[in-house]
């Protein structure tokens, strides 16, 4: 298990700099309106369908990062290899959990069986994660996928978990334990994942240039995440 250590000054500055970007995700109108049950079913279903490619591809992004772990048996190679491998196995379950989430909220199962072409505002985050996890450093890939995505996701799922019950009496929606499994899982365990991701980033981003790149990647990932959420109002 990766041990959480005190942050060096550059990580404190990193966290301060990305806080506004994270807040635009966690406090997004989508989640506020889920809490108040004013998000329309059409908007909810549009998001569930068009975010599915991100969910389905997420273990692939992590596998791209796994391929960058330096060969050998050094401490951080072992830790990072094991951490990514374990998380990939877990993430492979999440696409199925998301499908149950969507179907429970009235999305026809066939809509998730065919290829999905998300609007560009939503698909941008997929393209960015493919690029960073394919072509950038291990630290940047971890910053994008495992910190900038998993961190805010752990926070917003906590906010909406109980509020989803507000939709129970809506016609065509069936809420049960399996429907909420994706949200429940992320609300419960993603607290530690971002902290562990930061430890890996600290181990591999050693120069000022690498540290600046990690920061910029996290910011841009969160910008695309917020853009994708905002588009739910303009498109669906």
Spans of features found by a protein language model:
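Non-heme di-metal
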Residues: 1-236
